[in-house]
Curated annotation (Swiss-Prot):
The keyword DNA damage does not apply. Monomer. Hydrogencarbonate 1 binds at T136, K140, A142, G143. Fe(3+) 1 binds at D79, Y111, Y211, H267. The gene is tf-b. This is Serotransferrin-B.
Length: 701
C-alpha cells in the first residue's frame, strides 16, 4: 500500500471517528466500599443505550464535592446540610433532582428530623445536657444542623460564637460523649465504632455514620439519644423506642408529625452549576429508577440514596441550593457558622437597600441615595425575579413589584409593605399614613383606531405584552384567553408576540427588538427588563405602534405616551385619539372609557420585603415620602414618583402616594382572592409558570 493511500485511509478513519457521537457518561461519586459495591451493581444492571454509569470512590462527602467541582466526578446525592455546603464557594454546585418519600401520585420532598430515645429512659428534651448522643454526621441536617440549632435557640447550649471557640467544642462540653462522624473534637468521636483511620469518618466506613448508623449507636448502648429521621427506626423496634419532643413530652415513633425537631427538605442530587451534565444525569436517573434498584441494596441501608425514597424528581432549572433549602433553613445553617452571642442586641438597621432592575433605575436610585442621607442604598439586578431572590438571600431589602411578581414574591415568603395609590381626583387617602383604601388600576387591551381587531377575534393577532408574569400585560389577558379557549398553549393561539421573559427562540419573542440603540451595557432581546425596548407598559405600547396589533397594558398607558407627554422619537407625534380599547364583549371604546371597557380591575403595585424587615422598611419609606413624595418638604430636590431617562422607574409615574399596608396582611389578602385565584389557575399551565415560582413552590418544608 503506497503512502498516499495509507494517508487517505487514515484521514478517512479519523473523519469517521470524529463523526461518531461521543459516549455520554455519568460519573457517580461514592464514599465507602459498600456504596462502591452498590454502584458497581448499578453499572451492570442499569443499561442505558446512550448514557453509561461509572463509579468514583472518595473517602468522604467533602472530597466528592471537590471532585465534582473539578470535573473528576459528576454527581452525588446528599442531605440538606451538604446541599448548603456544596452551593457555596469553592464548589458552586446546584441541586437538580430531589428524593421523593411520598408516592408516584402524591409526592413528598420533605422529611422530619427527630430525636429517638429508649422507652426505658426517662429524661426530657430540656435534660439533654450530659447525655450520650448519636448523630448522623457533622453538618448533616437531622443529625447536626437542626438539633444544634434548636439547642442554641432554646438556650440549652451556650456558645459565644466562632471568635471565642468552635461550635464543636461547645457541643463537646454539652454532651457527655458522642459519635458525630466527621467531627474533630475527641469527645464527639469517643462513641464511634470505626477501626483505625475509619473511626469517626464521615462515610459508611464508620459503622455509626448516617441514619442507620446513628440508630445502631443507640441500639448498642453507645448513646442515650439518636438524632435521625422519622423513618429510621424499623417498625419491629417501635415498641422499644419513642420520640423526644421539644415540649418535654415523649410520643410513639408513629406520632412524628406531632413530635419532631423540624420538617426539612429532601436529599438532593448535586452537580456543577454550569449544567454541562445536568440533562444526562436526569435522563439516566429517570430511566434507571424504572429499571434498577436505586433505593435498596444488599450491602447496607441508605447507600447512594435513602431507602425511604420511592423516586427522584427533577427540580426546576432555576433552582439553586438556597431556594431548595428555603430561607429559614439556609439562614439557620449560616447562624450555626457565625454564632449568636448571648444577650447580644442586633444593631439597628438604618438604611433600606433598594433593588433596581435597569441602568435607568440605578441612576435614579443613586440620585435618591445621595440626597437621602444614607437612608437608601441601591443594589442591581437584571429583573424583578432577580430582585426577589436578592431580598430572600439578604442582599437587598425592598423593591416595588407589579401584582404578578407580587404573587411570586408571596409564594417565596415576602410580604407587602406599602401600596401605590393612583387616583389624582381623590387624594384624601394620601393624607394618612395608612388607609383602608387600596390603590387599583385597570388592565386594558389597546388597538389602533381603524383596525378590525377585537377581543373576539384575537386568533393569529400580533400581541404586545409588558412581560410574562406581569398583571396587566400577561396574567389578566392570557388568563382570560386560556379560560375561554381551554388551551394552555397561548403561543399557538395568537400570532407573533413580544412577551419579555419568554424563550427568545419562541413566537412569543418574535416581535421583540432588544435595545436598538445599544445604549445599555447588556442588550438582551426579550429580556424582562429595560434591556428590551418593548418591556413594561410604555414598551408594550411602543410595540403596538411599531409592530403589533394589540397591546396589553394599564389604563393610563396611552395618556402617558401620547399628546406630547412622551418626547421619545417613537412617541412624540402620537395622538391619544388614534387608539381605542378592546372590550371583553367584542366591542370597542375610546381610551377614556377604561372604567367600563377593561379586562379587570387589579391591585396596585406595592413595595415588598421579608416579614422580619417589614416595620423597618415601612418606617424608612414613610419618612422618605414625607420628604420626596408629591407633597414632600423637599420635593424640589428629588421626586420619588417622577422618572428621567425612562418610564415608571422604581415606582409608577402615576403614583400619587404610598399607603402603608396593615401589618400581618398576607400577599393573598392584598392581591384579593379573585386575582390570587386567577393567577393560581394560570400557573397550572406549565408553559406560563415562572422558574422562580416553580422553585419557591416545589415543596413546603
Amino acid at each position: 500500500m503506497d503512502l498516499a493511500l495509507r494517508v487517505a485511509l487514515c484521514l478517512s478513519m479519523l473523519a469517521l471517528c470524529l463523526a461518531m457521537p461521543k459516549e455520554k457518561q455519568v460519573r457517580w461519586c461514592v464514599k465507602s466500599k459498600s456504596e462502591l459495591n452498590k454502584c458497581r451493581d448499578l453499572v451492570n444492571t442499569c443499561k442505558n443505550k446512550e448514557i453509561t454509569l461509572s463509579c468514583v470512590e472518595k473517602p468522604n462527602t467533602d472530597e466528592c464535592l471537590t471532585a465534582i467541582q473539578e470535573d473528576r466526578a459528576d454527581a452525588i446525592c446528599v442531605d440538606g446540610g451538604d446541599v448548603y455546603k456544596g452551593s457555596l464557594q469553592p464548589y458552586n454546585l446546584k441541586p437538580i433532582m430531589a428524593e421523593n418519600y411520598g408516592s408516584q401520585t402524591e409526592t413528598d420532598t420533605c422529611y422530619y428530623a427527630v430525636a429517638v430515645v429508649k422507652k426505658s429512659s426517662t429524661f426530657t428534651f430540656d435534660e439533654l445536657k450530659d447525655k450520650r448522643s448519636c448523630h448522623t454526621g457533622i453538618g448533616k441536617t437531622a443529625g447536626w444542623n437542626i438539633i444544634i440549632g434548636l439547642l442554641l435557640e432554646k438556650k440549652l447550649l451556650s456558645w459565644g460564637g466562632p471568635d471565642t471557640e468552635s461550635l464543636e467544642k461547645a457541643v463537646s462540653r454539652f454532651f457527655k460523649a458522642s459519635c458525630v462522624p466527621g467531627a474533630k473534637e475527641p469527645n464527639l468521636c469517643q462513641q464511634c465504632a470505626g477501626k483505625k483511620e475509619h473511626k469517626c469518618s464521615r462515610s459508611n466506613n464508620e459503622p455509626y455514620y448516617n441514619y442507620a448508623g446513628a440508630f445502631k449507636c443507640l441500639q448498642d448502648d453507645k448513646g442515650d439519644v439518636a438524632f435521625v429521621k422519622q423513618s429510621t427506626v424499623p417498625e419491629a423496634f417501635h415498641k422499644d423506642y419513642e420520640l423526644l419532643c421539644p415540649d418535654n413530652t415523649r410520643k410513639p415513633i408513629k406520632d412524628y408529625k406531632k413530635c419532631n425537631l423540624a420538617k426539612v427538605p429532601a436529599h438532593a442530587v448535586l452537580t456543577r452549576s454550569r449544567d454541562d451534565k445536568t440533562k444526562d444525569i436526569i435522563a439516566f436517573l429517570q430511566e434507571a429508577q424504572k429499571e434498577c434498584k436505586l433505593f435498596s441494596s444488599q450491602y447496607g441501608k441508605d447507600l447512594i440514596f435513602k431507602n425511604s425514597a420511592v423516586s427522584l424528581i427533577p427540580l426546576p432549572p432555576s433552582m439553586d441550593g438556597f431556594l431548595f433549602l428555603g430561607a429559614d433553613y439556609s439562614n439557620a445553617i449560616q447562624a450555626l457558622k457565625e454564632g449568636v452571642k448571648e444577650d447580644e442586641v442586633p444593631a439597628a438597621e438604618t438604611k433600606v437597600r433598594w433593588c433596581t432592575q435597569s441602568k435607568a433605575e440605578k441612576n435614579k436610585c443613586d440620585d435618591w441615595t445621595t440626597i437621602s442621607g444614607g437612608a437608601i442604598e441601591c443594589t442591581e439586578a437584571a429583573s424583578a425575579e432577580d430582585c426577589i431572590v436578592q431580598i430572600l438571600k439578604g442582599d437587598a431589602d425592598a423593591v416595588t413589584l407589579d401584582g404578578g411578581y407580587m404573587y411570586t414574591a408571596g409564594q417565596c415568603g415576602l410580604v407587602p409593605v406599602m401600596g401605590e395609590y393612583y387616583d389624582q381626583d381623590d387624594l384624601t387617602p394620601c393624607q394618612r399614613r395608612s388607609s383602608g383604601t387600596k390603590g387599583v388600576y385597570y388592565a386594558v387591551a389597546i388597538a389602533k383606531k381603524g383596525t378590525k381587531v377585537s377581543w373576539s377575534n384575537l386568533r393569529g393577532v400580533k400581541t404586545c405584552h409588558t412581560a410574562v408574569g406581569r398583571t396587566a400585560g400577561w396574567n389578566i389577558p392570557v388568563g382570560l384567553i386560556t379560560n375561554e379557549t381551554k388551551n394552555c398553549d397561548f403561543a399557538s393561539y395568537v400570532g407573533q408576540s413580544c412577551a419579555p421573559g419568554s424563550d427568545v427562540k419562541s413566537k412569543l419573542c418574535a416581535l421583540c427588538i432588544g435595545d436598538p440603540e445599544k445604549r445599555l451595557e447588556s442588550s438582551k432581546k426579550c429580556s424582562p427588563s429595560a434591556s428590551e425596548a418593548y418591556y413594561g407598559y410604555s414598551g408594550a405600547f411602543r410595540c403596538l405602534v411599531e409592530k403589533g396589533q394589540v397591546a396589553f397594558a394599564k389604563h393610563t398607558t396611552v395618556f402617558e405616551n401620547t399628546d406630547g407627554k412622551n418626547p421619545a422619537g417613537w412617541a412624540k407625534d402620537l395622538k391619544s385619539g388614534d387608539f381605542e380599547l378592546l372590550c371583553p364583549d367584542g366591542s370597542r371604546a375610546p381610551v377614556t372609557d377604561y372604567k367600563s371597557c377593561n379586562l379587570a380591575e387589579v391591585p396596585a403595585h406595592a413595595v415588598v420585603t421579608l416579614p422580619e424587615k417589614r416595620t423597618f422598611v415601612a418606617e424608612i419609606v414613610v419618612n422618605q415620602q414625607s420628604l420626596y413624595g408629591r407633597k414632600g418638604f423637599q420635593k424640589d430636590i428629588f421626586q420619588m414618583f417622577e422618572s428621567t431617562g425612562g418610564k415608571d422607574l422604581l415606582f409608577k409615574d402615576s403614583t400619587q402616594c404610598l399607603l402603608e399596608i396593615p401589618k400581618k396582611t398576607t400577599m393573598q389578602e392584598f392581591l384579593g382572592d379573585k386575582y390570587h385565584t386567577a393567577v393560581t389557575s394560570l400557573n397550572k399551565c406549565s408553559t406560563t409558570k415562572s422558574g422562580l415560582l416553580a422553585s419557591c413552590t416545589f415543596h413546603s418544608c
